[in-house]
Amino acid sequence: MKLYNTLTMTKEEFEPLEEGKVKMYVCGPTVYDFIHIGNARPLIVFDTLRRYFEYKGYEVIYIQNFTDVEDKMINRANKEGITVFELAERFIQEYYKDADRLNVKRATKNPRATEEIEDMIALIQRLIDKGYAYVVDGDVYFRTRKFAEYGKLSHKNIEELMAGARVDPNEKKEDPLDFALWKAKKEGEPAWSSPWGEGRPGWHIECSVMAMKYLGQTIDIHAGGQDLIFPHHENEIAQSEAATGKPFARFWLHNGYVNINNEKMSKSLGNFFTVREIIEKYHPEALRLFMLQAHYRKPLNFSIDLIEQAEVALKRIYTCYENLEFLIQNAASSSENDDKLKAAIEELKAKFIDAMEDDLNTAEATGYLFEMVREINTYANSCSKETLTFAKDTLKELCSILGILEQYSAKEEAIPQQILELVEKRNQARKAKNFAEADRIRDELKSLGYIVLDTPQGTKIERIK
C-alpha cells in the first residue's frame, strides 16, 4: 500500500516497523464541546485506514488522545462554574456517543492528557538536561533553533517561520519561535506540582508523551488534520526527536479542510454544524459516506444538499443488500447470468482494493462500490442462490472496510403481525383472481405505512420511509 507522507511530500510504500503490526497515533479532540463535522473528518478517514489495515490482516494499535486541559476548556469550565475535569468527562461521553453512531471503532486506548502529567514532567526535564529547553519564571520553553531540522514537516526554514510567527507577548523568551513545554500557574486554572513550580503542560508536549508512552519512541503513522502540520506536529517532532535522538514517526498523514457551502467553516459566520445536529436529521452513515466520497487530502465542501445526496446513495446500498437477502430465500439453483455477475463483482472488487492501496483513495473505491450495486441490481433477479450469496457477502465485505452497512435498517423494526396477516390475505385474494380485494388490501397496507412488491420470487414487504 502506498501512502502520501507529508514529511517527504511523496507517496511511499508502507511497511510497518514490526511485521504484522501497525502503530498509529491520531490527534483527538479538545473535549470542551460537541465535535463538529471538521473534527469528524479525521475520525472517519483514519478509522477507515485502520479498518483497511485490519482487513489486510494487520493488528492495529490505535491511540487517539483527549486534550482535557487547554485554554478553551479552562474558559468554558470557569464560565459554567464547574471544574475542567467535570467538563472533560461530560464531553468525552458525548464524543463516544457521536463516534459510535458514526461507526468509528473504539481506539486501543484514549489517553487523557491530565492522566499523563508525570511522564510529561519527565520528558521536559530530559529536554532541559540536554540543553533543548530552559526555565523562565516557572514557564519552560523549547529552544527551537537548537533543533536543526525544525521546519522539516511544514517544509519551511526558520526565516519563513519567523515571518509568519505569532509572537508570544512573554518577552523573557530567548526567541519568538520558542514554544511552551510548561506553563506557570495562573489564577483560575488547574495546576500540578513540578520542579519549576505549579503549572500545567503545553499542548504539544502532551501528544509527544502519549504517543511514545503507548506506541514507542518511533511509531508507524502519526495522523491528524492539515491544520495541525504547523505548529503542532512540527513541534511534536522537534521535542520528541530532541529527547530521543530517533525519528518520531515514519509516516505523517493529514486530511484536508472541511468547508461549508464553499466557505471556511466558522462559528462567527454562522455556518457551523456539529456532528450531533447532522446525525439527528440524517442517517449517521450518510455523513460517513459523504466524507469518503472525496479523497482525504483534498478540501471537502459540505452542504445540506450534498448530505441529502449521500443519504440517497446510502439507501441504494441498503436496498441492494436487503433485496439480495430476499432473493436468496427463493433463488433457483443455477442461472445463465451467474457467470456475468460473478465476473463483474470480482473485477470491481479488485478495482476497489487497488484504489484503497493507492493512498486510501476512497473516492475511487466508493465509485466502484456503486458500480457493483448497479451490476447486482441488473442481474440479481436471474441468478442462483450461490451467486446471490457471493454478491451479498462481497458487498458486505467492502462496505465493512468503509464502515457502512453496519446499522442494518431492515433489522431495526420487525414487521407487525397485523401487516403479515394482511399480506397473506392479499396473496390469497390474488390466487383466487379477486384483484379488487387484493387492490383494497394493498391500499389498506399503504395507509398503515407499508408497500408490497410482487416479484417472481414472491411478495416483498417494505416500510414506507
Curated annotation (Swiss-Prot):
The keyword Ribonucleoprotein does not apply. Its EC number is 6.1.1.16. GO terms for molecular function: ATP binding; cysteine-tRNA ligase activity; zinc ion binding. Its main location: cytoplasm. A motif ('KMSKS' region) lies at residues 264-268. SUPFAM superfamilies: Anticodon-binding domain of a subclass of class I aminoacyl-tRNA synthetases, Nucleotidylyl transferase. ATP binds at K267. It catalyses: tRNA(Cys) + L-cysteine + ATP = L-cysteinyl-tRNA(Cys) + AMP + diphosphate. InterPro entries: Cys-tRNA-ligase, Cys-tRNA-synt_Ia_DALR, Cys-tRNA/MSH_ligase, CysS_C, Rossmann-like_a/b/a_fold, tRNA-synt_1_cat_dom, tRNAsynth_Ia_anticodon-bd. Signal peptide: none annotated. GO terms for cellular component: cytosol. Binds 1 zinc ion per subunit. It is found in: Cytoplasm. A motif ('HIGH' region) lies at residues 29-39. Zn(2+) binds at C27, C207, H232, E236. The keyword Kinase does not apply. Gene3D superfamilies: Cysteine-tRNA ligase, C-terminal anti-codon recognition domain, HUPs. PANTHER family: CYSTEINE--TRNA LIGASE, CYTOPLASMIC, CYSTEINYL-TRNA SYNTHETASE. Monomer. This is Cysteine--tRNA ligase. It comes from Caldicellulosiruptor bescii (strain ATCC BAA-1888 / DSM 6725 / KCTC 15123 / Z-1320).
